[in-house]
Every structure is written in structure tokens, then in C-alpha cells.
Amino acid sequence: MNILERAALTALHRMDPEKAHSLSLSALRSGLVPLPGPVTSPRLATDVGGLVLPNPVGLAAGYDKNAVALAALMRAGFGFLEVGAATPRPQPGNPQPRLFRLTEDRAAINRFGFNNDGAATICARLAMRPRGAVPVGLNLGANKDSPDRAADFAAVLAACGPHADFATVNVSSPNTERLRDLQGRQALTALLEGVMQVQAGFARPVPVFLKIAPDLSDADLAEIAEVALASGIAGIVATNTTLARDGLRSAHARETGGLSGAPLFERSTRVLARLSELTEGRLPLIGVGGVASAEEAYAKIRAGASAVQLYTAMVYQGIGLAARIARGLDALLLRDGFGSVAEAVGTGRADWLT
């Protein structure tokens, strides 16, 4: 991390977390933030569910919810970006305060509740984005007051799919009441059928991923793996934030909402490894949760991930983190004799299944 990045983070950490979040996006939009540019190599370039990535380090949904800083983020060293979640209609989300830094734990708790500008506005921004080598996907959400949340996911995909490189069905946010109920076999099967019917009507392929919670039993994971394999989706994103609060030290540890960051790493990686085992490598997995270094990204890949995503770690390490992780990952692959990311996927899975 350079001196300028460190100074900017220090200033942002003196502010309310949500205001700091908004200011960071405004700074990116201004064009004044120094950015590392693209990071790739023959080892890092990879294919995940039909997405061709310059490197496997992605930005998780939730940072640029409304797709307002895409031009800058595409130059920040990420191999792919995910914006949203977008819902059919704009909604304000939950009352503030709803974002909390847990500095001692290198973590955050949020209870945003899918606050966003709505699908129409976000779709228009996706359509106007610069085209380049960095795929941009959309996290699909449902309105809080919707009488048919499954239909909401399909509606957002229908509206925005032509302008997105991929889409993620988010049934795992803990901040919309009863949303996680859609992870059950019957509900999930019906939901994915509706989404995949929409996808089938597109003129070009738009891979669809499913994002799951880390707070699932082994039986739940087995059901999800079975449904996912049968549905025709491109892969699974594992995982979203957790409701667990084990071992936290920060003053905000008991705030309600989803916990992200360092404390999620082990839990999410164990879920990832179990999914890799259940799907027998037939379904690409994207590992999310606590990735803050090249070593942690590499651990996710060796546990079964074909790519990784991060967000909370940027709160503590800055916008240049993705590029640093990608370069470090390249060195780790070279050190261990892997010619590609794909060669390393799942090679350490057994370590996470004990």
C-alpha cells in the first residue's frame, strides 16, 4: 500500500462508514484516484463458467451497488466485477446506521437491505459502461415488499441481462426477511427454472451463478448442489455474509446483519470445499469471504474455487489490493509449478474437509 492510499484510508476511517463508502465511490468517479491498471499473465488468465477472465480476482457485489464507478473499477486490477444487488423497483433499504466497521477483527457488519436505484437505472449504467477485457456482472435481488420474490429475480435478469456479462442470483443475504428461505430445494428449483427460462431467450450467453449463505448444514449444501447441477446454472458463489459472531472483539460485534471480512474466511472456505466435493468439480465455484491476501486467494482456489471475490478487505487495505493479490497469486502459482489457475483448483480441498 502506498503513502497516498494509506492516508486516504486513514481519513475515510475517521468518517461514518456509509459516508466513507459513498465518498470512495465519488473519488473513483472523479478520475483522480491512482489505479494500478490491468493485471494478467498466461497463468492468471482463466475461464469460469464461460467467462474469460484476465485474472481470477473479482470485486464482490455490494461495493458498487448502483454501477456508478465502473470505468475506474475496470482499471483497478480486478479480473471481473459484480455490481448490485439490483431489485425491480428502487428501494431505500433499512434505516441507518446499517454499516459498521469491526476494525479489531478486520471485518464489517452490514444490514443494508438491498438499497439500490432499481433495475432500470442500473441497467442503463451497465449499457453505457466502457467495454473491455474485464467482465461485469449483476447481482440479482428481490424487493422487500414483493409478493413474488422468485419472479423479481427473473424480472431483473430480463431487464438487465442484455447489458451484463453474467448474473448472480442472490438468495443468501441475511438482511431481507425470509430471503434465505429460497435456498430450500423446492423454492430454489422453481426460482432457478424461472431465471433460466429468461436466460434462454438472450441472443448471447449470460452465465448465471447462484450465491449461497455460509450458515448451511451439510444436508442443505447437498440439496443445493443437486439443484444447481440439475438447473443448468454456470456455477455457485460461496459464500455471502454470516450471522455467526464467534470470537469477535470489536465493540460493534453484536450489531444485527451480515458479518464479512477476516472472521468469515475459515467458515466460507469449508463450505466451498464441501461444495467442490459434492459437485465433483462439475460446477465452477467462486470463493468469497475473508480474502485479504494472495495466500488466502490461493487457499480458496486450492480448496475448490476457480476464482475469488473480495470487498471488505479493501476497507482496510485500499483499492490497490486486488492488483497486489493478483500479482502475488501469479507468483504462488509459479512457485508451486502450476501453469494455470485451473491446474491448482481443488488441489488442497482435503485440508478443508477434516
From Swiss-Prot:
UniProt membrane topology term: Peripheral membrane protein
SUPFAM superfamilies in UniProt: FMN-linked oxidoreductases
Residue numbers annotated as active site: S173
Record's cofactor remark: Binds 1 FMN per subunit.
Any one GO biological process: 'de novo' pyrimidine nucleobase biosynthetic process
GO molecular function: dihydroorotate dehydrogenase (quinone) activity
GO CC, one annotated term: plasma membrane
Keyword Signal: no
Catalyses which reaction(s): (S)-dihydroorotate + a quinone = orotate + a quinol
UniProt main location, coarse: membrane
SUBUNIT field: Monomer.
Protein function: Catalyzes the conversion of dihydroorotate to orotate with quinone as electron acceptor.
Protein name: Dihydroorotate dehydrogenase (quinone)
UniProt organism field: Cereibacter sphaeroides (strain ATCC 17029 / ATH 2.4.9) (Rhodobacter sphaeroides)
Gene: pyrD
